[in-house]
Amino acid sequence: MITGLLKKIFGSRNERLIKQYRRKVVQINALEPTFEALSDAELQAKTQAFRERFAKGETLDALLPEAFAVCREASKRVMKMRHFDVQLIGGMVLHDGKIAEMRTGEGKTLTATLAVYLNAIAGLGVHVVTVNDYLAQRDAEWMGKLYNWLGLSVGVNLTTMAHDEKQAAYAADITYGTNNEFGFDYLRDNMVYDDSQRVQRPLNYAIVDEVDSILIDEARTPLIISGQAEDHTDLYRRMNSIPPLLTRQIGEEKADGTGVEKPGDYYVDEKSHQVYLTEAGHEKAEQILLQAGLLAEGESLYAPQNITLMHHLYASLRAHSLFHRDQHYVVQGDEVIIVDEFTGRLMQGRRWSDGLHQAVEAKEGVQIQQENQTLATITFQNYFRMYAKLAGMTGTADTEAYEFQEIYGLETVVIPTNRQAQRKDLQDQIYKTSKERYDAVIRDIRDCFERGQPVLVGTTSIENSELLSHLLNQAQLPHQVLNAKQHAREAEIVAQAGRPKMVTIATNMAGRGTDIVLGGNVEKQAGFVMADESLSDEEKARRVTQLQDEWQSLHEQVKAAGGLHIVGTERHESRRIDNQLRGRAGRQGDPGSSRFYLSLDDQLLRIFAGDRVRAIMDRLKMPEGEPIEAGIVTRSIESAQRKVEGRNFDIRKQLLQYDDVANDQRREIYKLRNEILEAVDAGDLVKNLRESVFVELFRAYVPAESMEEQWDLAGLEKTLRDDWGVEVPLVKTVEQAQSIEDEELLTQVQEAVEAVYAGKVAQVGRESFAGFERSVMLQSLDTHWREHLAALDHLRQGIHLRGYAQKDPKQEYKRESFELFGRLLDNIRNEVTRIIFTVRIQSQAELEEASEQIEEDLSQLTNVQYKHDEFSELAEVAAGDAEIHGETPPVPAHRSAAASAAAALAGQVPKVGRNDPCPCGSGKKYKQCHGKLA
């Protein structure tokens, strides 16, 4: 109440910010006549003048009014478009490192030019991040005219580009590209073997278009670069025959033993997207595996040596019960292609990790591709937080404002519209069954079609879009279908979705980034005419004029019919996605309307609100085909959506907390790697490694502050001679001396070590040997880092079980991953020193050949793939941590001893004795820990 009163008196935070920005708008507008009077050459010279002023110490904030006024004037001359005042506000919000929420059709692309131009003056690079290559290329070409006119260079970073083209794109003042490509380039830059092979500059400033889609929807899963691992394809085929032999349990068993409607062998938890074997299912699966010869007599499926079987069985169960054809994926030729759940687009080249993709391939009977080993990985949260300044724009960010602030430190500012919105959002209509719902949708579409009103129908899956298309064909209503299967025609279909009587079916937000103009997009059509080389210039001009006249007539006709009508056939689990669909209508003050048609069969209602709504319908004795249209039901659905959004936020937050641990380690490894790459001679670094290795070795035989009787000098001599090629007569030295300190012996060892090292360098020369050392360090660091990533994956997958031991899984993960990281650094240090000391090289040519071979072995990774999964094991861990289920995980959490990472990499689990330390890393004996479960 008090908060509301204060808002009335002082205005909300958003209103106060807008008021501050409006004061600057007045300054910019006051400069307009001055810049209008300048010639083209004088206006273009302003960019260099701004750069000189910036170099002398003037800030970008001080340059803002003039720079915005110059950009606006240049846009009027080059683009024939003048920035509205609200677009100037949007530009200032972006420059301040905030998120600008601008309604669809308010000109986000043009708004961004202001902040991009101002920040490009600094010469440190500006990245404009889009959701796909098409938009990156379109915006770079479209806005590139303006930037080039102002003397700025523009690059576009595409997936298909060659290495030198990418370097040129990043060297430009402004670089357009997709979120995935920027992230993958960062990872690839940290895998190169020569500093000149890098493409990115330090990350300075990024503007993320459709920021909600990139930083929230796609942030649940990491970017992964992977290479081929061990072949388990036959095991996937054999496991695929098991799920059909098991029956699904209906209902989840509660603590009091109730809740199970129909007993079965496994239970599917749709909320957490997981499958769990019941006790009966566990026994049945063991019997099947025993008969198949995959499990030995008397062995448990949960025994450590059978973890691989467990992993494959769960992958197969999930493939059969949670992932459905034409909803989560499509089959094209001999390939399973993932469908993006948010856009409905096909994600070519992407694969689910953790064996899930192979399990789906086995289910569909297509060729099973080998599993991959992670070579490098990062989450979008941690990639984008590396930019010195980050900003974003979208039509729908306000519902996620808290998350943007909490995770990225980004404030959301809602920008006022240039014209008052005219769209009417009608009440949801809820039907008992899907059939009744679709009947109502067809009636609504027919009504609009007969009145000449264009309709955009939103569906949540390819399956539903094809079902609706079938129903419209039966009803003899012409229409266009826009889903992942029609990706190539996407922009063309969306551009014409505003023509009279046009009915367009779209999965979710496919076609985002292309405006739906009432009467159709005349610019697109004119573009096709201008690109037709068979026409003369006169004919092109005549046809374009004719198109513009026709468009004006169609535009007025559609406005009179009520503008674009949006039909939602199902609520998405996020209110933001629903708002995006609604936002396609009523752009720039145009008329428009929207309505959602729901049924109690919808997944969202079934899981979260179905019983409550069904009870209301039964109480009201609703006849068949009659919808319920009430605020209480809509509020009930929004409450369900808020629950899902809250849960997804928790998953992303937990994902980030886990990845922050790996991120700290990633930063240290990449920093060390960059030091090696940039150093002309890494001799000092090698010396530090060498000294610490031999001090540690010496102390293993001669403990600090120990008595002479405790020294094992003969053993130390033998180890130095046999393992390191270093001869030191330690026993003789002690025998000849009346008394000697251990520090004197250490000095003697170090001098002998340095003498051997100096001899190796002298053989081939310092310059050649430095190159060899650099190659060895990079090879060792990269190999051990990959093994470390595999070990972290395994640790992460089972860590939530620590909750049962009253331990905080996140703290346990931090502790154990830190121990693993310590081992990683020890392994690198020991391996580098050992290779340098044991290498037998007679000539400079041999040394150079060895260096080249090392780099070639590492750079020629087989089957390298770039993945950004829809839902990965990382997100599952976060979900498991938030809502623990009493099942044993499919993979061991962690293995003690130096062989753990290598074993994890090969997918092998060593047999564990009852009195050995438990593989989970708890520190307990196996029989007292996970041995109980076996």
Curated annotation (Swiss-Prot):
Record EC number: 7.4.2.8
Intracellular or extracellular location(s): Cell inner membrane; Cytoplasm
Group of enzyme by EC: translocase
Membrane topology annotation: Peripheral membrane protein
Primary location: membrane
Entry GO CC: cell envelope Sec protein transport complex; cytosol; plasma membrane
Positions bound to ATP: Q87, G105, E106, G107, K108, T109, D515
CDD domains linked: DEXDc_SecA (cd17928), SF2_C_secA (cd18803)
Residues at which Zn(2+) binds: C918, C920, C929, H930
Protein task: Part of the Sec protein translocase complex. Interacts with the SecYEG preprotein conducting channel. Has a central role in coupling the hydrolysis of ATP to the transfer of proteins into and across the cell membrane, serving both as a receptor for the preprotein-SecB complex and as an ATP-driven molecular motor driving the stepwise translocation of polypeptide chains across the membrane.
HAMAP family: SecA (MF_01382)
Family per record: Belongs to the SecA family.
PANTHER family: CHLOROPLAST PROTEIN-TRANSPORTING ATPASE, SECA INNER MEMBRANE COMPONENT OF SEC PROTEIN SECRETION SYSTEM
Protein name in the entry: Protein translocase subunit SecA
Organism (species): Ralstonia nicotianae (strain ATCC BAA-1114 / GMI1000)
Gene: secA
